[in-house]
């Protein structure tokens, strides 16, 4: 799976965390592991321009998704297998997200993880234009975020245990001689 991140926002964010959450959601949603995703982080002025150009709405927004058409290969039945699908682009605005995070009482990292999940779900065809769609998408988004956080906590604890085990083994080597 190829996930490219381009941070043009001027705000320092954990690109590794964005890749981690995107990779987690793509795997959980059973997307082909060879899929490709592009993520761009913009400042509020650039996001406002993009928001006006594509959505005809003034001002910046937190996340925009631009799906590619390659997800549905179509074509002749005897055509060769298509290559890795390009899911599309997710555009995030960390400055806008920071304001939302402060209002919600959580970190920017948490907000960007949530928005990354939201963006991936849009690329996979989920929408929230209708009340039923919104309920389904936001419930899935919340569940995926909860599962990703639990996965991160488990990985952290495993890393700490491995470090403790390594130190214990190092100490025990002093007594072997």
Curated annotation (Swiss-Prot):
Function: Single strand-specific metallo-endoribonuclease involved in late-stage 70S ribosome quality control and in maturation of the 3' terminus of the 16S rRNA.
UniProt keyword terms in alphabetical order: Cytoplasm, Endonuclease, Hydrolase, Metal-binding, Nuclease, Ribosome biogenesis, rRNA processing, Zinc
Protein name as catalogued: Endoribonuclease YbeY
Native source species: Mycobacterium avium (strain 104)
Gene: ybeY
Cofactor binding, note field: Binds 1 zinc ion.
NCBIfam families for the chain: rRNA maturation RNase YbeY (TIGR00043)
Family named by the database record: Belongs to the endoribonuclease YbeY family.
Transmembrane segments: none
BP GO annotations: rRNA processing
Database matches in InterPro entries: MetalPrtase_cat_dom_sf_prd, YbeY, YbeY_CS
Record's signal peptide: none
E.C. number: 3.1.-.-
């Amino acid at each position: 799976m190829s996930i490219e991140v381009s941070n043009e926002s001027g705000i320092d964010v954990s690109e590794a965390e964005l890749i981690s959450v995107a990779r987690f959601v793509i795997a959980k949603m059973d997307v082909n592991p060879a899929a490709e995703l592009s993520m761009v982080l913009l400042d509020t002025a650039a996001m406002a321009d993009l928001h006006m150009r594509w959505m005809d709405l003034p001002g910046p927004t937190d996340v925009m998704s631009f799906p590619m058409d390659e997800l549905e290969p179509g074509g002749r039945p005897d055509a060769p297998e298509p290559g890795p699908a390009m899911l599309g682009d997710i555009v995030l605005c960390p400055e806008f997200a920071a304001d939302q995070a402060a209002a919600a009482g959580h970190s920017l990292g948490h907000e960007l993880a949530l928005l990354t999940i939201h963006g991936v779900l849009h690329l996979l065809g989920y929408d929230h234009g209708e009340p039923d769609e919104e309920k389904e998408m936001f419930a899935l988004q919340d569940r995926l975020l909860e599962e990703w956080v639990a996965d991160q906590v488990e990985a952290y604890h495993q890393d700490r245990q491995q470090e403790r085990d390594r130190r214990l083994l190092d100490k025990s080597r002093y007594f072997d001689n």
